[in-house]
């Protein structure tokens, strides 16, 4: 038996949607031992395949920051919470954090929350941290 010394690395996520996809791809490729398959344009298709095959665990590694009105119309989501404004949907989600400032709800969540709830359209609300 070979004993491995435990270790970890902190990977800072790059900004924007591309940064989310690249962060998830990096974690997923380590999980699948396929780091050598990363290319400049492989992140998004890799993540889309994970979503399509319902392998959503790795999506938790992609932090998503959204900015939306504290109250208002839904952003085209599907599912049981679709009738709720985006901010309220995330307030009711235990894997999301919402901070209201001057009528704007700043949401911190992860891509798994969006994918599993049919809220991928909310990526139009993407904001910086």
Q: Where do the model's predicted regions map?
A:
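A conserved ligand/cofactor-binding region detector
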Residues: 1-129
């Amino acid at each position: 038996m070979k004993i491995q010394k435990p270790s970890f690395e902190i990977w800072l996520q790059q900004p924007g949607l591309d940064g989310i996809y690249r962060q998830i791809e990096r974690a997923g490729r380590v999980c699948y031992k396929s780091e050598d398959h990363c290319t400049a344009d492989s992140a998004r298709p890799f993540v889309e395949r994970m979503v399509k095959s319902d392998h959503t665990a790795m999506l938790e590694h992609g932090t998503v920051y959204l900015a939306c009105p504290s109250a208002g119309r839904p952003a085209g989501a599907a599912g049981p919470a679709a009738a709720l404004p985006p901010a309220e949907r995330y307030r009711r989600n235990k894997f999301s954090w919402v901070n209201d400032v001057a009528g704007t709800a700043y949401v911190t969540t992860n891509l798994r929350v969006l994918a599993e709830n049919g809220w991928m359209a909310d990526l139009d609300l993407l904001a910086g941290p």
